[in-house]
Amino acid sequence: MKLPKLLLLASMMSPILATSSYAAPYPSGVTLDETQEITLNNGAEVTSIDPAKQAAEPAFNLGRDLFEGLVIQDKQGKTIPGVAESWSVNDNNTVYTFHLRDAKWSNGETVTAQDFVYSWQRLLNPSTASPYAWFAAIPNIENSQAIMKGDAAPESLGVKALDEKTFQVTLEEPIPFFTKLLSHPVLAPVHKATIEKHGNRWTQPEHIVTNGAFTVSEWKVNEKLVMVKNTHYWDASNVVLEKVTWLPIGDANVVLNRYLAGEIDQAVSIPAAQKKKLIQQRPQEVASTSASLGSTFYYLNTQQGPTKDVRVRKALSYAIDRQLLTSAILRNGGVPMYTLVPPQTDGFKSHTPEFATWNRHKRIEKAQQLLSEAGYDKSNPLKLTFTVPTFSMDVKMATTMAGMWKSRLGAQVTIKQLEPKVFYALKEPTDITRGGWTADYNEASTWLDIFVSSGEYNDSRYNNPQYDELMARSKTMSNPSELYLQAESMLIEDMAIIPIYRPGNDQYLIKPYVGGYELTNPESSYYRKNVYVKAH
């Protein structure tokens, strides 16, 4: 793995220095508008903006702007300093020491090393019930697994404040991508006194204290969340935007209509039926995304119902025409997938499964054969429940897939639509559940860790001791690629999921007066601190 910072060898420690110079907030020659405000769509209402309670991309979008961790990412996904202006690691790569800059909370108080100690302990504490606690355990921080299981006190976590500005982390085993993990929003600090005073209401606009580029001024659930510039942010002089209004709209058609009416400044998902025409009519508003580290798949319940039978799971996967879905339904640059991990992931290239090499006719024939062997026919049709959020494209995809299964397998599929907030909180998966993952960090384990038997987001309820062993062994290796390949091949052979597509290069609409908002980060980690409004 590439080290994100310059490594300088010394006798006992290897200081990693912040070599990135911060660019000017906007290019020379640009005239700024007097009103620095934008309105964006977040896709859904969030369950929480508390870093420890965030669990999906809409919340992470807000989290990156409100709270800043030790490091952040640049527009290409490289790790750059955040609250930590430099750090060092010992010769064994097990002790990291972070040196904090003069950062402030939005109430003017100093961000300290103890804030990180408190926040990371709180994240892993079972009483917090963080849906992303598992993520904090990935880096092998001393005692993290035991704390998460309730077998050790949160105070035993291998983190300490050496002084107000020095935060130290001790790992049980070295992990080559440790610093890459640290830009994730759930590892940002929170303000202890505010939480202790206001409890679960600490994130309300009248109470919240943040350390990111913005803070919250207004939040009307299911209507809008308004952020304003945090004047105490350490890099506030380079933050141009004064206000960001986020809307929780799940329907791409509604988003587009509001964009065309001038009420939203960006439309990332253009409905396929209107896309070609709009791109031709508005060339000055067209921008392109780069292929992000994402993977869209569908969970198959491996523990109960018809999908408990691997023959049924394989039949469902084989019967899907991925090329048709991506070219005729999605029409967003998506690339068909037959495995889990995207090919542009650092240090990893999936083995192509045999069924991916078959032609369409052979796949359907094999699917029908497997379903017959499983005991299903016209007199005993396969009946399934397929759960998706109410996003228009998810419903359209599910309807098309259900049609394929009906025409090719005689399956009777009931599509269960849930509001996004309800869907993301779903605890018990049905036969088929909409899945997908955008990388938390650029390494194959961000996807493969999902499917260990104890995985928080293992909605397939996949339970394979051999898979668990491979992933456990991978944590102690400096180059675990071969184990990752074995694990992914096992997952696909067991067909715990139906991989469908990965994001490719796509085009979207953005108002020509919005600058600094290039969608080029492979992990889709974007920061509104980089955005500005040009005079128009």
Can you say where each PLM-predicted feature lies in the sequence?
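Aromatic- and charge-enriched surface segment that lines or borders ligand/interaction sites
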Residues: 85-134, 168, 258, 306
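A structural "hinge/loop" feature
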Residues: 25, 44-60, 83, 131-132, ...
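Alpha-helical secondary-structure segments
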Residues: 113-119, 164-170, 174, 212-213, ...
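N-terminal lobe/hinge region of extracytoplasmic solute-binding protein
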Residues: 41-91, 121, 207-210
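Extracellular/periplasmic solute-recognition and catalytic clefts
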Residues: 217-228, 245-304, 327, 336
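Gly/Pro-rich hinge or "lid" segments in bacterial periplasmic/extracellular proteins
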Residues: 145, 150-156, 160, 165, ...
